[in-house]
């Protein structure tokens, strides 16, 4: 793996220190010397039939080739739940009864000397509600090329990455009239905002096939958009917002001449507009089996006015809009974009959105900004709502392939901090706010790596994004000849940065490899982030409080995320161990 040693997760379970307070622990001694060696020969590709499962549901596994003597093992974190011999290319497992839990299934064999050889892995998310651990993807093209078999193939890839919710971008007819046709008569084909063909059957097939994989389907639309023909469809002049007080200059989002229309902006707090668009959404739900509404906005517009000349407080109107949408369709899910964090606290404060969604730009371009957003969202959402970043990678790279080191470093940081990344589409990865843009491709190596990273995020979700308290740790490399600079968050160039959290009596330490980083921005604008310098056999000393019972490590960059127990010694208030 080109990216090895970039993202480690080491956890020290303290059997007498559940709170993390400790008592100094200077006198604790001990350690573990007898651990099973682990290596890997990743020749077995595994799939499951769904992206997530309810407790007690049957999980169906398929493997492309299983060598004789292989076993399948199911673990949550580092604990083996069950194990079985496998024969044949498919088998089933009953998801355990505990809700909201991540598992890693691995196929392995044991060598004569006792070494375990990992042959392949796959994560399993047992969660009755997808919004507890959202892994968001997208679809954005619905033309004649999207046959049922093509859609099945695309969604199979998203399923392999455990994508449990899919945003439908640029699927609609008009922002103020999203359905192609009427409630009583759908158009077989209609044009989207860019005058692309949209096949209603393709939209329906995407939804149906996503549902077969256990995914949820969310339709995208602005909260306040209308096209230039909106008056003919019943949209009133009094509903718009204006750049001045004289209601003559409508606020607009300008688009290319070849597109249908510019988008003119309405007052999201106007009760008549809310009733109008809620009824349009009702027409959508009556015909298309969407699970909810991904609400969009356009960030800070500056001073804007309603028809009567009153200044409009947009974040306040978002609250009113969200409440109106939930009131009309209480059983449907809502998510709203906080563009550059605009309106984030108000959106979260409604208590009506299922997770938080931040589209991040140049004003939030650094890794430290991601941390700041997650911390703020944690407060805004009363510690209950997860965060998804819409973060467009390699934004200024004109063509070719995505830069794998940049993608994986950003994902590593987001996942370590407890977020997730909207980036995976059925047929391409996201490089632009215009979701149909396919100017950059994923290499086969990146596709493989992304599967490993999403397995990792899913299998270890209970350590990554399920509560806990952040803490600073003292971690040093005890071999000066390695010439390694270890620092605690925030990241530094030419360093390995640790980020630590205490979760359910375990100390979780992430090691993020910035040794070769040319920037501390997540954007990797031109796709120039270098591959990180690989570090192996790194002897480490970690200060700890309380007695440590086990040290284990996992990374998406080695053994396909399978965990490995490490030998360690504890004395003088610290443990020493070697990171493989």
State what each model feature region is.
Residues 172-203, 231-268, 299-316:
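Aromatic- and acidic-residue-enriched carbohydrate-binding clefts of CAZyme catalytic domains
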Residues 482-545:
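Carbohydrate-binding surface patches
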Residues 4-41:
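Bacterial Sec-dependent N-terminal signal peptides
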Residues 128-148, 219-288:
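Active-site-adjacent "subsite" loops/lids of carbohydrate-active enzymes
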Residues 569-580:
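C-terminal beta-strand-rich structural cap/linker in extracellular carbohydrate-active enzymes
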Residues 268-356, 361-375, 381-384:
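Active-site neighborhood of glycoside hydrolase catalytic domains
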């Amino acid at each position: 793996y080109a990216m090895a040693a970039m993202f480690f997760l080491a956890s020290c379970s303290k059997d007498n220190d559940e709170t993390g307070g400790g008592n100094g622990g200077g006198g604790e001694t001990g350690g573990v010397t007898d651990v099973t060696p682990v290596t890997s020969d990743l020749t077995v590709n595994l799939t499951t039939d769904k992206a997530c499962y309810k407790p007690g549901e049957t999980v169906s596994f398929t493997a492309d080739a299983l060598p004789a003597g292989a076993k399948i093992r199911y673990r949550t974190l580092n604990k083996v739940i069950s194990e079985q011999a496998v024969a044949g290319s498919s088998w089933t497992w009953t998801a355990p009864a505990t809700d909201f839990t991540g598992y890693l299934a691995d196929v392995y064999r044991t060598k004569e000397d006792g070494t375990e050889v990992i042959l392949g892995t796959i994560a399993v998310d047992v969660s009755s509600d997808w919004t507890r651990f959202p892994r968001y993807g997208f679809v954005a093209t619905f033309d004649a090329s999207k046959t049922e078999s093509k859609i099945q193939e695309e969604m199979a890839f998203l399923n392999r990455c455990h994508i449990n919710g899919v945003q439908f971008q640029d699927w609609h007819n008009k922002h103020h009239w999203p359905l192609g046709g009427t409630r009583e008569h759908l158009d077989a084909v209609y044009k989207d905002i860019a005058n692309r063909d949209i096949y209603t059957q393709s939209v329906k097939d995407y939804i149906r096939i996503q549902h077969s994989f256990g995914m949820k389907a969310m339709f995208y639309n602005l909260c306040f958009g209308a096209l230039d023909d909106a008056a003919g469809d019943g949209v009133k002049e009094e509903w718009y917002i204006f750049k001045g007080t004289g209601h003559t200059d409508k606020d607009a989002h300008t688009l290319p001449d070849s597109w249908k229309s510019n988008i003119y902006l309405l007052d999201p707090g106007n009760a008549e507009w809310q009733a109008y668009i809620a009824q349009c959404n009702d027409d959508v739900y009556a015909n298309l089996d969407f699970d909810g509404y991904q609400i969009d906005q356009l960030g800070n517009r500056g001073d804007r006015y309603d028809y009567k000349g009153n200044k409009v407080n947009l974040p306040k109107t978002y609250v009113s809009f969200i409440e109106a949408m939930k009131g009309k369709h209480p059983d449907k899910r809502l998510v709203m974009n906080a563009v550059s964090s605009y309106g984030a606290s108000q959106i979260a404060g409604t208590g009506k959105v299922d997770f938080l969604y931040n589209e991040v730009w140049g004003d939030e371009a650094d890794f430290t900004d991601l941390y700041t957003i997650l911390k703020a969202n944690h407060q805004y959402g009363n510690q209950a709502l997860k965060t998804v970043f819409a973060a467009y990678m390699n934004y200024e790279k004109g063509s070719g392939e995505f830069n794998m080191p940049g993608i994986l470093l950003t994902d590593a940081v987001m996942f370590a901090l407890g977020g997730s990344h909207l980036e995976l589409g059925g047929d391409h990865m996201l490089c632009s706010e215009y979701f149909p843009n396919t100017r950059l491709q994923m290499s086969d190596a990146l596709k493989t790596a992304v599967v490993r990273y999403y397995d990792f995020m899913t299998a270890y979700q209970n350590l990554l994004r399920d509560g806990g308290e952040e803490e600073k740790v003292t971690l040093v490399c005890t071999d000066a000849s390695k010439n390694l600079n270890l620092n605690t968050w925030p990241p530094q160039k030419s360093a390995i940065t640790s980020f630590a959290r205490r979760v359910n009596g375990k100390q979780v330490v992430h090691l993020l490899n910035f040794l070769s980083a040319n920037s501390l921005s997540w954007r990797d604008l031109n796709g120039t982030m270098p591959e990180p310098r690989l570090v192996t056999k790194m002897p480490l000393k970690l200060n700890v409080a309380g007695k440590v019972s086990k040290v284990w490590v996992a990374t998406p960059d080695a053994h396909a995320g399978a965990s490995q127990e490490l030998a360690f010694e504890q004395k003088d208030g610290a443990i020493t161990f070697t990171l493989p």
